[in-house]
A protein has these predicted regions:
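Structural alpha/beta core scaffold segments of enzyme domains
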Residues: 1-358, 362, 379-387
Length: 388
């Protein structure tokens, strides 16, 4: 076999990230707007700016993809760790030219997935081999296969700018985002993020300023992009939380007080009133509004359960952020120590408001897992690509 490099054969993720950074420093397509940010920022006494990047992220499930397939009596029978057995059945049927009723998928324990096993490529591989060989076939990927042939979480770049009055109050707010869309995995020639992706922690940012603007940029998809846990909330939550802290530092106030100021005094966040095509995770805003009081309650809970405002030894500090994802509200405070350039996490506290917790232990374990997953991304995550 002689393989061709394809259109992304020279893709370099580090260089691509630099290009995205330069792009988000320019005006993009407006996704939400109130007032006139560009006019107001010129009137501001001072401004704070920041750019944040997130590299491609692999899923790295504890158990790599695996599937067993057996074609017998005109039936393709599959045993696989899949998150979407209906989709796996449909893809296998399409690949082999079989009726859907001729494909049976037995769902095994996932062994971790985080979105990776919603894609059935490894199932199709086993089914194809079993169909051609007419014997049972078991396929299991090595960790190297898993990392190299993942559907990665999107690489991204974000730009933020805030304008401050003479008294230090924030009067103007700008956010820009750029990342390859998941839709590019299914349809060619799509470069812009969907409204659903922009609804994940971007156009629904709970920022209440008189002048604000949210813009998106296009981005090429050079590798396969897929779902990973909270999807676009991963990079949007990181960018927003980091910048709120930057503004707090510029104002010399506590980050929790900075959040309170930016949340304002309204009862709900209404992105659709500012022109956003907001999807709210497919839920009704009447039933699941974005409630400001729930954000503020989380701040109070985390402050009360930690000593985050106490004096700390040299080299230690507390970080705080919060986010709404899939209609649940989460706040986290983290105490870290930096020694010789190495970040050591000493303590983490999380509060969640997910409404009625039918199984509190399950909610607790979910948040514990999210903490570990988030720390992995922040401290050790990331995939680089060179020569495609």
């Amino acid at each position: 076999l002689e393989w061709r490099d394809g259109g992304s054969g020279d893709h370099d993720s580090i260089e691509f990230s630099r290009e995205m950074v330069e792009k988000v420093k320019t005006k993009g397509s407006v996704a939400r707007e109130r007032g006139d940010f560009y006019k107001q920022i010129k009137r501001s006494t001072r401004s704070v700016e920041a750019v944040y990047t997130v590299p491609y992220q692999p899923h790295q499930p504890m158990e790599p993809p695996a599937a067993t397939a057996w074609f017998h009596d005109g039936i393709m029978e599959v045993w696989a760790c899949v998150q979407n057995p209906q989709s796996a059945r449909d893809e296998v049927a399409s690949l082999l030219g079989l009726a859907k009723r001729k494909v049976v998928v037995h769902v095994t324990l996932l062994g971790g997935a985080f979105g990776r096993k919603s894609k059935a490529d490894f199932v199709c591989e086993a089914a194809y081999l079993a169909h051609r060989s007419r014997r049972p076939v078991k396929v299991f990927w090595s960790r190297e296969d898993d990392i190299k042939h993942d559907y990665y979480h999107a690489i991204s770049a974000q730009y933020y700018q805030a304008g401050l009055d003479a008294d230090g109050s924030v009067n103007a707010w700008l956010q820009r985002t750029s990342f390859p869309t998941i839709a590019s995995t299914f349809t060619r020639m799509i470069w812009w993020p969907s409204a659903g992706e922009l609804s994940q922690g971007f156009v629904d940012a709970p920022i209440d300023t008189q002048h604000q603007r949210f813009e998106s940029h296009s981005a090429d998809a050079h590798v396969r992009i897929g779902w990973m846990r909270s999807v676009a909330n991963i990079h949007h939550g990181f960018g927003l939380g980091s910048f709120v802290d930057e503004v707090a530092v510029a104002k010399a106030i506590r980050v929790t007080d900075m959040w309170r100021e930016l949340l304002g005094n309204r009862s709900t966040v209404t992105p659709e009133e500012d022109g956003a095509d907001y999807k709210n995770y497919g839920e009704s805003l009447d039933r699941y509004p974005i409630e400001v009081k729930r954000f503020k309650n989380l701040i109070d809970v985390v402050e009360a359960s930690t000593d985050m405002h106490a004096n700390l030894p040299k080299g230690q500090g507390w970080g705080f952020s919060m986010h709404r994802s899939f209609a649940s509200y989460v706040a986290v405070a983290t105490r870290v120590e930096i020694a010789d350039g190495v970040v050591k996490v000493l303590d983490m506290h999380a509060a969640i408001d997910c409404g009625l917790a039918v199984n509190p232990d399950r909610v607790k374990s979910q948040i514990e897992g999210a903490m570990v997953f988030g720390l992995t991304i922040a401290l050790m995550g990331g995939i680089s690509v060179k020569q495609g």
